[in-house]
Amino acid sequence: VETFIVCVVGVYVLRMVVMMLYAFSIRLPVFKFNKIERLSSILKYSLLIIIAGSIATIILDIDSFMLGLYIPIEEVAYYGVAIYIATVIVVPSRAMQQILQPLTAQYLNEKNKVALKDLYVRSSQTLFIIGGLIFLLIVLNINSLYETIPPQFSGGLIVVFLISMAKLYDCLMGCNNVVLFNSDYYRVVLIFGVILTILTIGLNMIFIPRYGINGSAQATFIAIAVYNTIKIYFVKRKFDMMPFTIDTGK
């Protein structure tokens, strides 16, 4: 275990060094200690974005915590393994959103609604295709995948399927979060996140005592589906655009 942790830390440090050297090769940083204008607004925006962006991760941690209150602790480990398997689906989405961040900010600043809508739709279609492929690979090979880990962790097939569906819905949203974070409506993401948290806790209290880890997965799936639907509807109302079209299902 200690060797594994050292290797993981080493990989992250190596990645940081490589990225730092590449960035320095393009342009060396210049340190200046000037007075920052509108510092309070910048700090407020940064704090809200950090909190709102952490909601999805916090939700999965809430699930694990609440499971420990209702079921044996070993079943929480089964749930954790299933969650990590399903989370692979959104890895391409996280990478693409970092790329889309400056483009989205540019189009919003220029009020270029045509380009923004095109980016919204294309990002949704691209991520849905990639996420859908990973989803199929996971679902079709889940039994073989569980054979590679200890048998005691092989529970949670339903959890993998439900959380994978929720993550696939995240992919279908395209750059929805990026649009909200870079617009004047970034505050509402935090409000939606609070609603999601309350909904998740309430559903977990109902489903976990009845269905165990499968109940927690059901609660998470319902909460994320409601959360994503609200955000899609909000962007539709404020920007008059949807992430998917008739061609999405083809």
Predicted segment positions?
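Interhelical loop/hinge segments that connect adjacent transmembrane helices in multipass membrane
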Residues: 2-5, 17-60, 103-118, 237-249
